[in-house]
Amino acid sequence: MATLRTHNLTKSYGGRTVVRGVSLDVASGEIVGLLGPNGAGKTTTFYMTVGLTSPDSGTVELDGLDVTDDPMYVRARKGIGYLPQEASIFRGLTVEQNLLAILETMGLDAATRRTRLRELLAELNLTPLAHAQAHTLSGGERRRAEITRALVVSPKFILLDEPFAGIDPIAVSDIQKIIFHLKERGIGVLITDHNVRETLRITDRAYIVHGGVIVKSGTPDSLTEDEEVRRIYLGAEFRLD
């Protein structure tokens, strides 16, 4: 079983400490949320985990090996995929060309590339959109294409930054199903998103960050019933359903 883990991550900006010793872990086939109010430190923690920001202290480990100093492209090769909130697809290319752009960096022969391309397009039902220009895709279709592109290199983990932002309710449901599919494939998923209800509905467990520390962790049901979590984040009237 693969494991992605952080140990005692800290980060300060201009003398202000925004993350104070955060430790978390994600295992293969597990969907984990990283949640909290604005300014809590969750985004900085997420960025340190993926490699966008360097910690002042602490470590990030993949299967027990320290990857803290590895740049993002090295982490990706080792199995840590990342999907940013912003559009990351090449807008001037078709869906098929977006996937081929990654496949062509992998040293595969032409026949193997074409076979793998067909498999990837079919996996998340992108075959009908194979020749569509990326800039013509809806928000949900674009998310689907970006997740498929992340699957090209067979990641152990995928870190999703605001996957439910800017898409309509039907597309949210589709993306949730795709995330469940990643879980079924044995891929570990770490999600940070302001859409707390949509996130908690699909997570196995979640961490709640407040004031730069993890104040609570647990299953969605346990967190939504926790008085402190309601006080600092969810609100007294919050319900999952």
Which role does the model predict for each range below?
Residues 100, 111-129, 176-180:
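Conserved ABC ATPase "signature" region
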Residues 66-81, 86, 110-114, 130, ...:
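ABC ATPase NBD coupling module
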Residues 154:
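Conserved catalytic motifs of ABC-family nucleotide-binding domains
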Residues 35-37:
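The feature captures the beta-strand-to-loop junction immediately N-terminal to the Walker
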